[in-house]
Amino acid sequence: MSSEKSTSIEKLTKYYSLQVVSQERLYNFLPKINILGSDKVCCDFIHSLIDQICGKIISFDRFINDENQRIIYQLIRVYTLFINKVVGKDLKKEFICEDLKTSNVDNIYITAISDCIISRFQDIKKELTEKLSTISSSSLSDFDWKMNAILSSDRINIVQENVLLLNLTIETNINDKKEQVLIELSKKELDHILETFDQINEVSF
């Protein structure tokens, strides 16, 4: 039996799959997967997520009821991030399990989640590679922006929030095609993007 183990992976955070400490708080939501009630339903949920990552149109209605709707939508976002991260870093099953264990996911779900990801690993990797290739062959050719003031209500008071609307013109190398992408950013989201750009700039120089 081979004693080979990938024990030399460097951890930049307490998780093998994360490189930015600020993202650790997102993984705090991973244990909420137990709301699904069984490892069988968990497997169905994870496979549905993987199908969606691979480009299929998936409905998650069968997992949702009036009581868990908010949690399920958050699980979709967090586990999509998790799957993309572990596959993007090409992590072995032991490290996927270790990350789930670190975030306090129950053992029965750790096995179910890791088995699902490993069984579809190459499908996910192929899809991520194709998406990366598409992004790499594209470039920003123009942009425009404007500020909008929107009103949001929480039934107690009404708050005016400034929102940045960023219109990007993306030029691809495929038939010189140009695409328009509209991004809506709150101040918090814009601050996060600018902070990320600062970090990238520091690494570059």
Swiss-Prot record:
Coiled coil: none annotated. Signal peptide: none annotated. Residues 139-205 form the COMM domain. GO terms for biological process: signal transduction. One of its GO terms (molecular function) is NF-kappaB binding. Belongs to the COMM domain-containing protein 8 family. This is COMM domain-containing protein 8. It comes from Dictyostelium discoideum (Social amoeba).
